[in-house]
Amino acid sequence: MKNYVVSDPAIMMGKPVISGTRITVELILEKLAAGETFDDLIEAHPKLNKHAILSALKFASEALKADVVYPLKKTA
C-alpha cells in the first residue's frame, strides 16, 4: 500500500497529513471516532480516498507502538 502520510514543517506545523492536502491524521481519527464512515470522510474531503484513510490508520497504529506510556484517568 502506498504511504499517503507525510510530515512537513511548512504544512500544518509539521503534523502528519495526507500527501497533497492539509487533512491531518488527527482529523481523520477524530471524525472516525465520532462515528463518521469512510464514505462520509471522502464526501466531505474529495481529495481523500479509502487507501489514504487506511494509511492514516496504519500511521496512527505504528505511532502508538512506540514504547511510550499514556496514563489514562479512570472515569466514574
PLM feature segments, named:
Residues 2-17:
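Short, Lys/Arg-enriched N-terminal segment that forms or immediately precedes the first helix
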Residues 8, 39-40, 67:
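Acidic side chains
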Residues 13, 29, 71-72:
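Generic N-terminal leader/processing signal
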Residues 18, 23-56:
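Amphipathic, hydrophobic secondary-structure cores in small proteins
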Residues 48-74:
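C-terminal structural segments of small proteins and small subunits
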